[in-house]
Amino acid sequence: MATQEETFKKLVAHCKEYGFVFPSSEIYDGLGAVYDYGQNGVELKNNIKKYWWDAMTMLHENIVGIDASIFMHPTTWKASGHVDAFNDPLIDNKDSKKRYRADVLIEDQLAKYDEKIEKEVAKARKRFGESFDEEMFKQTNERVKANVEKRNALHKRFATALNDSNLEQLKQIILDEEIVCPISGTRNWTDVRQFNLMFSTEMGSTADGAMKIYLRPETAQGIFVNYLNVQKTGRMKIPFGIAQIGKAFRNEIVARQFVFRMREFEQMEMQFFVRPGEEMKWFEYWKEFRLKWHKALGMGDENYRYHDHDKLAHYANAATDIEFQMPFGFKEVEGIHSRTDFDLSQHAQYSGKKIEYFDPELNKSYTPYVIETSIGVDRMFLSVMCGAYKEEVLEGGDTRVVLNLPAVLAPVKACVMPLVKKDGLPEKAREIMDMLKYDFHTNYDEKDSIGKRYRRQDAIGTPFCITVDHDTLNDNCVTIRHRDTMAQERVAIDDLHTILSKACNMRETFKKLK
């Protein structure tokens, strides 16, 4: 059986082979941590964005969307705190010359303790069977107790160092835990230092008159500076939200794990404006709703979990992540934050504008508090691909690679195939494709054997293959083959639209969010 690392490498290769993701500028040997989405990748990505956008703006009558500019007045980023506080703690290994985020090295060490604990629990569960009491085992097994104690002690030191921004303590933790460089295997570390993540450029025609501006590191600020515009023109009443999908840019020194951490990425963010004092109620609401949204895709409830922050951002009074089980461990795909009134108050201070809301029920004005949901499109894309990628051994020893993608997200919903390239079958298949293509992304394939064509569609996650044979010309029926089960059934051509609609329409998925 392949290790998780080997499976992940196969997935990355699969993404390139089947037109999901390509290295950017590959003819020039590529550009580090920059990727292009291919013909199937862009369809999957667009479907993810539509699933999010509709869940926000269609299911919630008090949420509207905007599309703010990437370039913003530079004072925006001074007000938001990004100029002074948007940093990562970095450390170098003197032997390998490689640079790492100090906090990530320590988080990986915490994960190793968790893995040791889970390994002991798994062995005991297998040994004792149904009579196994996991909690009692954790409380009494000496090896588990020792690892729990080490983990808790490390977690406490780590949280304290982060909250105090104590770079010396972060390095000391790395030394005390004997964390080695993955490349050199040595513990020859430099001091930890802060590095600002924003890309800057200049706007203007001359060097003397140019203004220093930034590529936005997040989409949220475009929402905050448009709060008054949207609230007034939309006659919005508290509570209400503003949603946005757009590109953001961060000069990540340690960009890694394929599209998980990139320098150019896409965000789906929603800022929800509420009365001060009600923010925790809405924080819990969005925390629950967003997890439901992920689980509704059917990628396995056990693959999701919450992770509360050890250190809160400068703007937050509560924060949690929704993590997905990637081949390289549980990793964040979405963050839910209670941002208080920090952003609106800062922009009011720096702009000199009054940014408030008059509440007719309370008969007073106030600066709203904000609950944020922020999800990375690229991380969501990767989580879906990781959850869907399967290598199966079939009866008779044959194998197949299949993407068990949720039908609502699949790049192609159906592929229409004539059994042979003659006898009027291609013409009939084209007729069926023309009938479906206005409502569903549909492919046509007549090359190679029917078995090879099935495998090609399995590899890109197409839920249905529709085969036109000689009987079709007489009975107006086709064979529809289901991707996950490979089961085949004979159905009337007139029923195809209904079958695909039921499986691929987001309405059925949205019902799970109630």
Task: Give, region by region, the residue ranges found by the protein language model.
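NTP/phosphate- and nucleic-acid-binding module
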Residues: 1-514
